[in-house]
């Protein structure tokens, strides 16, 4: 009887994980879900200082690419010496990531420019779902309804069949096709989030600090998936590996 009960509990836990990994979406911008959190938005605006949204880059200066492939081991390979990387310094530890600028130059250049300009400084992970992903990058409203790209406007998806939403990959959140801004998410699902492929731009992956990602994903949240205690991005450091 105890074995049967344990098996049932294990099955229910497995179903919970599959639900988290298979039925969620990653959104940014105004949605029904984030609109209902308006009171929380006002509180965040009092606690955090919104950054300017003026353009930092001319999107026409970024050379886009087509049909570029990446190595099969891109999600596990260490960065090469001299390669540009980012260290996301959070209140819970550091997350180090490398970029897929060869297939996602628009997303990569925007992220780097925003980080260098300090627009991600003192922002929060506003949406956290364990066994799915952690989301951040709203530097104006701090609740998932704001932020702007380094181009001062939305930019197109950069989708490649060679870059998938595997565990540890970093991708742009959006409010629909070609609506990328400043918000990004880190895939944390242990079984990968391949069903998101084709709808979101994967532009990097974590090479060190997934233990921090897991810790952030495990914090207590409210009904809007916002951490009860803010998880803060202190700043994002761009440097050579």
Can you describe what each PLM-predicted range is?
Residues 21-241:
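Cyclophilin-like peptidyl-prolyl cis-trans isomerases
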Residues 6-13:
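Sec-dependent N-terminal signal peptides
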Residues 14-15, 138:
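Hydrophobic alpha-helical membrane context
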Residues 1-4:
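Positively charged n-region of N-terminal signal peptides that target proteins for export
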Residues 16-20:
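C-terminal motif of bacterial Sec signal peptides marking the signal peptidase cleavage site
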């Amino acid at each position: 009887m105890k074995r049967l009960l344990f098996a049932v509990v294990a099955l229910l836990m497995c179903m919970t994980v599959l639900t988290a990994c298979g039925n969620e979406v990653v959104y940014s911008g105004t949605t029904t879900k984030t609109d209902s959190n308006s009171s929380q938005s006002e509180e965040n605006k009092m606690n955090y200082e919104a950054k300017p949204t003026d353009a930092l880059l001319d999107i026409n200066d970024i050379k886009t690419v087509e049909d570029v492939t990446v190595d099969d081991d891109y999600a596990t390979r260490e960065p090469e010496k001299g390669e540009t990387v980012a260290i996301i310094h959070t209140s819970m530890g550091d997350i180090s990531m490398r970029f897929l600028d060869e297939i996602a130059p628009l997303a990569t250049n925007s992220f780097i420019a925003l980080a260098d300009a300090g627009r991600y400084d003192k922002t929060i992970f506003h949406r956290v779902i364990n066994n799915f992903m952690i989301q951040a990058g709203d530097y104006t409203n701090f609740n998932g309804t704001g932020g702007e790209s380094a181009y001062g406007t939305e930019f197109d998806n950069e989708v490649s069949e060679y870059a998938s939403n595997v565990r540890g990959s970093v991708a742009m959140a959006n409010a629909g096709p070609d609506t990328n801004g400043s918000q990004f998410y880190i895939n944390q699902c242990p079984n990968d989030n391949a069903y998101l492929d084709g709808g979101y731009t994967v532009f990097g992956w974590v090479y060190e600090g997934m233990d921090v990602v897991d810790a952030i994903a495990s914090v207590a949240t409210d009904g809007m998936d916002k951490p009860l205690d803010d998880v803060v991005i202190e700043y994002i450091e761009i440097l050579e590996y």
